Amino acid sequence: MEKKLKRRESMSTTAAESPPAKRRRTVTGNENSALIEGLPDHISEICLSLVHRPSLLSAVCTRWRRLLYSPEFPSFPSLYALFVDSTSDTGRVNPSVRFMCFNPVSSKWYPLPPPPPDPPLHRILYRHPSFISFNLPIQCVSAAGKLILIAGSNQQLSPAISHPLIFDPISSSWSSGPRIGSPRRWCATGACDGAIYIASGISSQFSSTVAKSVEKLDLTEQNRNNHRFNWEKLRDMRDLRFSREAIDAVGYRRKLLMVNVKGDAVKEGAIYDVVKDDWEPMPEEMLVGWRGPVAAMEEEILYSVDERRGTVRKYDDEKREWREVVVVEGGEEMLKGATQVTADSGKLCVVTGDGKIVVVDVAAEPAKIWNVEIPDGLEPVSVHVLPRMSQPNFC
């Protein structure tokens, strides 16, 4: 962060020392002028795409800033979050559900366009008077560069979602996916190799058939463009122990990793091989690290956040052991109560039980940690990293 500030200060100083005419031309960024003087725009776009810090491009001129959000320019990662309206109402009134995107260049939150009216978001329950001690899960996953709302409960405590809601950041639009074979709630949801998976859980009433069933939807462009864009039934799970609560199925090296309960309770882990369509038990040395939310960086490196201690661990697949990641002083305190985590671009984005979003830069030594300021009156449920939205109002 200090380096970032110093670079911005350096840019400001350079601009202040430039001749007035040149400074006006740079800051104004005439729409008809070349992106880079003396170069065709298509060559300039290639050159600018090699700059890996969008904030630097945004600070130069309006035209470069607009280029950042154009469909022709490579997307930079942005943070997407599912929020609910925060409330201290003792009656546990159900709050509104909304989706927003955090732009790392402008450091501002922007609402996503309204999703399709079916299912209405206000019918998805997060709080209910019958469940005072915990909130009802609303399950989202990200895959193939898209955000998918896949499971939740309605007022009758039945599955609220029969068709997944899919948001595409590039087109800034929502669509309804094909009907889920067995709509469910309190299930395992995850993604691997561009496909989303839904497993176990409960339908309107408990069913052993649903509790063992697994379905897959391939979201890759090749599959979406053909006539087979439908849910595919996979090999059943071996038992019913994964229908107790909503859990994450973590995509890792062409496998899905699932652990049936959260917290310090006795756990059971299962691994689904997406290539062989087969199940195997999770090794004890891997299972022991599940002390909080877990995510896989680029589906290759596992990280866990201990919800009680706030420690970050990284799984060494060769040695089959979890190793603690050293973080800056006071970092563990910020991560206590972690409820959900996503991993991308060398960073972990963590939702904590006290309603905060914390970023951990695990590429740094020691790992740096900071809070992302969230909009007033909102409580984060889950976060995801996807390409930025192509919207001119970001500029």
UniProtKB/Swiss-Prot annotation:
Keyword Nucleus assigned: yes
Biological pathway: Protein modification; protein ubiquitination
Subcellular location: Nucleus
Key words, A-Z: Kelch repeat, Nucleus, Repeat, Ubl conjugation pathway
Residue windows of the Kelch repeats: 81-129, 147-194, 196-245, 246-299, 301-342
Domain called F-box: residue spans: 34-79
Keyword Nucleus among UniProt keywords: yes
Main subcellular location of this protein, as a coarse class: nucleus
Identification of the protein by name: F-box/kelch-repeat protein SKIP25
Gene: SKIP25
